[in-house]
Amino acid sequence: MDASSSDWPVHQLWPPSGDKRRTDLDIVLFHGLQLTANDINHAWTSTWTQRGHDNVCWPREWLPCDLGEAVRIFSVSYDAHVVTSPHDHVSEIADNLFQNIVDRRYKWQRPIVLIGHSLGGLVLKSLGGLVLKSLVVKFERESTIRSPSNSFSQATARRAKLFLRNVRGVAFYAVPHAGSTNICTYVNKLFRCKNRHHRGIMGTIKPYRRDMNQLSVDFDRIVTEYEINIYAFCEGRPMEQGILVEFSSAQQSARNNCYKVEDANHMEVCKPCSKAHPSYALLLQFIIDCGKVAREFDQALQKVHDLHQSTFENYPTFQVKWRYWCSP
């Protein structure tokens, strides 16, 4: 589905509609909370614009250029408005995305990198939990008597397994893995409402929720079992209510790399100023390392170092683990 379609939750940013070129890597973007009614329809592009240039969707304009165009880029759309969203939990959004992304529409036969901003990171973690659940169901079906009440088919489990095995990396931009009181306060003040964070989708952001803690535990299991590489970015510049997602909440786990984007607040952290900006250059390095198997990625890596050598000298880099892929 191309980016011009508004009635489908997954929009293809690259390659253009009708382009049948061979691609070697899939990237899927998950946007965060929405503050206006207009955001509901456009967050899948407006979240990922160059800072100061709202007409430039940087994943569409920059990544194909720097990755040799051998990439397929999707951006996911869902209603995550802080007040009017019909969803009470990220799991409801993830359930719909599971059906549209994993179970029905796309074949996931390439390396995959998932990228989430704010609430979008929790959505993709919940999606991963549903994928894992479908595999557990498959195992139980093969080990015990089949139950007609089980909603996951064998075909669904096969597609889910292929999806998980191809996820090479996940990048988080200011995701409140441990919740955020400041986001709740910010929304309450913005909409002049009290205790909004106790209701609807905002309840997901509330700190110390047992179900969200379990979501992180389940996601860590997936990361460990499938050797998925993680990189996180956190905001370095406060908004009116301060830092909305603290470093400790944005990190996901103590073993993950987490880079503080000093000149960006919560809304700007996923909006790089230029290709040389660390929030883009480090992400690009991460994507390239996750997609080492692709034909054009070694050339792309050299190109990145040539363009941004000073950036990589001044900011932390990281070593992505190699992994062994079993046959289906």
Q: Which residues does each predicted region cover?
A:
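Eukaryotic intrinsically disordered and solvent-exposed regulatory patches
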Residues: 6-17, 59-62, 99-102, 154-159, ...
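Serine-dependent carboxylesterase/thioesterase catalytic core
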Residues: 31, 83, 91-220
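Hydrophobic/aromatic beta-strand patches that form the interior of the parallel beta-sheet core
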Residues: 28, 74-76, 169-171, 229-234, ...
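C-terminal catalytic-base region of ester-bond hydrolases, centering on the histidine
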Residues: 34-35, 81-82, 185-189, 218-328
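Aromatic/acidic cage segments in peptide-binding pockets
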Residues: 43-56, 92-93, 154, 185-199, ...
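Short, conserved loop/helix-junction motifs that constitute active-site signature segments
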Residues: 21-22, 66-67, 160-166, 222-226
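Active-site catalytic motif of lipid deacylating hydrolases and related acyltransferases
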Residues: 29-112
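Alpha/beta-hydrolase fold catalytic core
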Residues: 1-25, 70, 257
